[in-house]
Amino acid sequence: DEMQLEGAMHNSESMAKLLGLLPHDADLEALTMSLLEEQVGGFYDPGTKSFYLMEGFSGDLARAILAHELTHALDDRLYDLDGALRERIGHTDKTGAYMSVVEGSGTELMNRWVMKNMARLNPEAMREFSKMGTESLQDTPTVIWKPMMASYMAGQRFLAAGRTHLRRNEKIRDPNVALERAFTAPPLSMEQVLHPEKYWSPEDRDDPVEVVRATAELPEGWSVVNEDVFGELQLSLVTEFADG
């Protein structure tokens, strides 16, 4: 399994460099880990069922991080996050869509915890938390940080849109129903996450259409190194680079 994950990282790096999204001397794994160290105060590893809190975080900051990461642990217990992510290896668009549900869930509950406890929280600690890691984004290639940030921000909006749709159109007021639907029948593309009506609304539902590669046999000496599926978010990064 580890070799499969390492191979996926290597293939992603090669493709990003080929498309001009990464400098040729860049190390995708090292850059990603560096960003995570600055951006993330803790994380839950569904593969080992373990939770980690970075050194230097305590008090209110640690509690806010715990609210987010322990949500992942609960979701994993219910929906097997590790199994779902492994099924999506090699399909960047589906992986991004699923991670948006995962991170949207964690972000929502964390924000609810912060709002509920706002009166007793340390204002300075919360200010530090809100800007945590923002400086490191300036030195990180867009192809790394933009999909990561989208999973938090767009994922939260996606789930909120689902609850609104269910309340208005199906008279369902239980906020957990939207989350359960999103996990048991996850969005199939980042397009559906970025435009929630294309997932939640039966009239506007827009599932991705598989494009079958219909090329002739590869010339002698050529071989397929990697195959992947890009969606709206990833293609926007490619066109953004081309326009720049």
Model-derived regions, located:
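A metal-dependent hydrolase signature that marks the N-terminal structural subdomain at the beginning
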Residues: 1-27
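Short pre-active-site segment immediately N-terminal to the catalytic Zn-binding motif
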Residues: 51-67, 97-98
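Active-site recognition of the HExxH zinc-binding catalytic motif
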Residues: 64-81, 106-107, 159
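Post-HExxH zinc-binding segment in Zn-dependent metallohydrolases
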Residues: 76-82, 86-127
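Short helix/loop segments within enzyme catalytic domains
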Residues: 109-134, 163-184
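Pan-zinc metallopeptidase signature
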Residues: 139-244
